[in-house]
Amino acid sequence: MTDDCAPETPEAPHLAALPDFDLLNQHGESVRRSDLLGAPAFVVFYPHAFTPVCAGELDQLADAAPALGIRILAVSTDPQPTLAAWHVQQPRPFDLLADYWPHGGFAQACDAFDDVTGAARRVSLAVDASGAVRARIETASGQARPLGWYEEWARRL
């Protein structure tokens, strides 16, 4: 990518396909890659629950979710009980997935893990109905991803 907010082209995504995963959501339910097949999705990595930038981003996505019409999976390295508590405090209409153990394994497989902080980086993936990653965006630490990126890719997928 040439800058922090520019999506990669669909011809040159960062990953060819979304890696396999099996993660618990805020309700303790297992969510797998196979659950996504047949419909497009956004996989949204974020560093931590209960933090202002992450909360603001996810609140913005929650407000836009009905218009986007695409499944959203928000992924952090927080443990599932933390995500459950955050959901009670700030409910959102999508899965909050715990990439806790092996710690950040899914984020690492998606090149969305910060080895220094031990948390996910601000990376989002646009995934088509076949599981192919069509686009990727990453923003700097503390910088929210633009909602327009999701709106554009919702139209393209």
Language model: regions and residue ranges:
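Chalcogenol-based redox active-site neighborhoods
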Residues: 1-157
